[in-house]
Amino acid sequence: MIKLTPPMGWNSWNTFGENINEKMIFETADVMAESGLRDKGYEYLVIDDCWSLRERDENGRLVPDPEKFPHGMKAVADYVHSKGLKFGMYSCAGNMTCAGYPGSYEHEFVDAETFASWDVDFLKYDYCYHSPILHGKYLYRQIGRAHV
């Protein structure tokens, strides 16, 4: 499907950097809905880097930082969706994100399943700490296959 306008919305990085939490995201969703931004086409609310723990769980899954997101990402997605917005998250093609959290390299399929279980609508996919042997074309194709 070809969209007439690019995806428009808000991303946590430029405002909060690594200092993000559930309360800030809920408040941002409220402002986007109540200020009219959503009605003007700004429909995506995206949580950028630094939302997870620094280690995956025993099943290789990403784990939201319970201090920042005590109710988990599914609850955050549900709240964002309740405001008529789409929920986006961040990951990276490398083995680490740009800020040093777990990246999706060699975990593309489990990460896609995890994001789907949280009802994520949009993925911002960065390119830090990537394999020097593999190039972006392969890495982006891999995450694309995982999300199909």
Segment roles from a protein language model:
Residues 9-14, 58-62:
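Glycine-/proline-rich flexible loop or hinge segments
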Residues 24, 28-133:
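Aromatic-lined carbohydrate-binding/catalytic grooves of carbohydrate-active enzymes
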Residues 76, 142-143:
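Aromatic/hydrophobic pocket-lining residues that form π-stacking "cages" and hydrophobic walls in ligand
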Residues 133-142:
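A short alpha/beta connector and helix-capping loop motif
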Residues 146-148:
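Conserved small/polar residues in nucleotide/adenosyl-binding loops
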Residues 14-20, 66:
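Second-shell loop/turn segments in exported
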Residues 1-13, 45:
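N-terminal hydrophobic targeting/anchoring segments and the immediately downstream early-domain regions
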